Amino acid sequence: MTLDLSKPATAGYLSGFANEFATEALPGALPHGRNSPQRAPYGLYAEQLSGTAFTAPRGHNRRSWLYRIRPAAVHRPFEPYAGAQRLVSEFGDSADVPPTPPNQLRWDPLPMPVEPTDFVDGLVTMAGNGSAAAMNGCAIHLYAANRSMQDRFFYSADGELLIVPQQGRLFIATEFGRLDVEPFEIAVIPRGVRFAVALPDGNARGYICENFGALLRLPDLGPIGSNGLANPRDFLTPQAAYEDREGAFELIAKLNGRLWRADIGHSPLDVVAWHGNYAPYKYDLRLFNTIGSISFDHPDPSIFLVLQAQSDTPGVDTIDFVIFPPRWLAAEDTFRPPWFHRNVASEFMGLVHGAYDAKAEGFVPGGASLHNCMSGHGPDADTFEKASASDTTKPHKVDATMAFMFETRTLIRPTRYALDTAQLQADYFECWQGIKKHFNPEQR
């Protein structure tokens, strides 16, 4: 099976989360009984791609063996890349990262580019924390593009890329095979995996959380039991597919927040077979099994957790990826929207589709908001008044929505670009100014 991004994929996927997969595009391309034979089938080269330390515990160890036409080392030397100058990977004080205000922040969608712009050149860093060099924290990027990647390929050595499309499908050709991803789905490209992105719908826009630290995993379910939230079988990994092309190609690498380019005389998407548990995957957010209260109160948003990156502190994650999908609300005598909140964690939100049930207006698909550590937030004035007077004896369906959140244990620091851009809503704070005083000490 070969790669062709000019049309939708016809191959199926491999089902499961972090399984030990084995797949080949040519019969017998996978060596039998060993990883690195003296001579691999079809004249291929054996190459291991390690996503964790060799000595990581078996349950956390991630690696794959790739059988490819040429090793990944075959390319010309890298040199600085002149494009995509709005990326940041170090989130200490700098010209790119000014002092972080405690204000609630919200942005309109990133505009579509006027000039031809592909996925790589359409990247801009909005915020983040930690350090790519120290392999902790994350960077939160937006992308807006209107052209497919042409004879160029990209990888990030800084972290795994959690991609959340908001507008336009992405046909992603990777070393492991192909992922077709549309809005309402997510894709995760592991650190180091080379890929190219085609835009079948012309324009594309979305969000990326680049995870510098421990790999994303499914959360433990605790009292929920053995099923629920994001079920492992619904995660899809590509089957092996390759292209054997020679020509003048460009390989772009992201290392320590900077982009580098190298000439390469062949397509690096030349893996004919592979096996292992370190591979790209996608997931349809519409398959999320939402948990909620059927008595009273609005549970904590941790019930909406899709993926987590764990820290060295039990119960505290470096990154939580949370969604707010369509769902039924049935709690009686309860304020049903998300409540007013101050959080030790920091919250970057985006909206894929529809409206968010805590904001009547201003938060639109493609937009974003940031509520940092201990910054008060919650429903706007209109939402509060309506929800306080609604009939809670009847269930209500929150429909036509798909919001999400990147939540982190440490401060999410907006970049200079994010604080200076015209998309920043200077009047965001006004949505709470109309909240009325109802207190009356004479009337309970």
Swiss-Prot record:
Which leading EC class covers this enzyme?
A: oxidoreductase
Domain of life per record:
Bacteria
Checking CDD domains in the record gives: cupin_HGO_N (cd07000)
PANTHER family named in the record: HOMOGENTISATE 1,2-DIOXYGENASE
Protein name per UniProt: Homogentisate 1,2-dioxygenase
Q: What is its EC number?
A: 1.13.11.5
Where does this protein act, in terms of pathway? Amino-acid degradation; L-phenylalanine degradation; acetoacetate and fumarate from L-phenylalanine: step 4/6
Q: What quaternary arrangement does the UniProt entry report? A: Hexamer; dimer of trimers.
- What does this protein do, in the record's words? Involved in the catabolism of homogentisate (2,5-dihydroxyphenylacetate or 2,5-OH-PhAc), a central intermediate in the degradation of phenylalanine and tyrosine. Catalyzes the oxidative ring cleavage of the aromatic ring of homogentisate to yield maleylacetoacetate.
For this UniProt record, give its keywords in alphabetical order, as a comma-separated list.
Dioxygenase, Iron, Metal-binding, Oxidoreductase, Phenylalanine catabolism, Tyrosine catabolism
Report the family membership: Belongs to the homogentisate dioxygenase family.
Binding-site residues, Fe cation: H341, E347, H377
- Could you tell me one molecular function GO term of this UniProt entry? homogentisate 1,2-dioxygenase activity
Any keyword Iron? yes
Q: Which GO terms describe its biological process?
A: L-phenylalanine catabolic process; tyrosine catabolic process
Residues recorded as binding homogentisate, renumbered to this chain, are Y356, H377
- Per the UniProt record, the source organism is Burkholderia cenocepacia (strain HI2424)
Give the catalysed reaction(s), semicolon-separated: homogentisate + O2 = 4-maleylacetoacetate + H(+)
User: Which SUPFAM superfamilies does the UniProt entry name for this protein?
Assistant: RmlC-like cupins (SSF51182)
Q: Name one Pfam family in it.
A: HgmA_C
**Any GO CC annotation of this UniProt entry:** cytoplasm
Annotated active site: H298
Needed cofactors: Fe cation
